[in-house]
């Protein structure tokens, strides 16, 4: 499908990620679970970005299945507070906006990645989804990195700063990805 739209502007709107919402039994509200958010919204946005999507539009900003909580009893957060879907979207909104998508490859089927170049600053950001139920060390072998920073969202963290380390060869960095997480790593080369 990507070859048919190459060179064209295209965009995607979210659809309802609200499985189980009609049940009176809150244990069936799948949309409240972190794993559900990561495997649905997280993967969908990543696939759109991988396909050079021009924009991903999320219509329902303030709704129990949206980016911010509302007064609905099914809301995972208090009214006006950011939901897990909101934090997933924030990784792309904060780290991919006004950048150029560049190619990135992982050698691990359970870690998905998209990368972005800020042509003004030369910074590169990699947004990583660890779809594994276990933490994983990741090496980013790029020469010339002067500074690296990372933030992560998982079941218990929301855009929290995490450590990065220099590889022994000094030709890249390492980062520990939590189980079932989305992590944004920003690399500075100047």
Spans of features found by a protein language model:
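Carbohydrate-binding surface patches
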Residues: 107-146, 180
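A structural micro-motif
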Residues: 8, 54, 146-148
């Amino acid at each position: 499908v990507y070859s048919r739209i190459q060179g064209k502007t295209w965009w995607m709107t979210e659809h309802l990620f609200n499985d189980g919402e009609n049940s009176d039994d809150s244990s069936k509200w799948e949309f409240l679970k972190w794993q559900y958010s990561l495997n649905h919204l997280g993967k969908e946005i990543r696939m759109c970005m991988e396909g050079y999507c021009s924009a991903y539009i999320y219509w329902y900003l303030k709704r129990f299945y949206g980016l911010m909580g509302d007064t609905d009893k099914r809301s995972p957060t208090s009214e006006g507070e950011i939901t897990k879907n909101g934090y997933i979207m924030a990784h792309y909104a904060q780290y991919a906006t006004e950048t150029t998508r560049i190619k990135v490859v992982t050698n691990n089927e359970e870690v998905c990645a998209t990368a972005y170049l800020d042509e003004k600053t030369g910074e590169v950001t990699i947004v990583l989804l660890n779809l594994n139920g276990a933490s994983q060390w990741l090496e980013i072998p790029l020469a010339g990195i002067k500074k690296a920073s990372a933030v992560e969202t998982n079941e218990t963290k929301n855009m929290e700063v995490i450590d990065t380390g220099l590889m022994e060869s000094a030709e890249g960095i390492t980062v520990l990805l939590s189980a079932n997480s989305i992590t944004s790593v920003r690399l500075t080369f100047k």
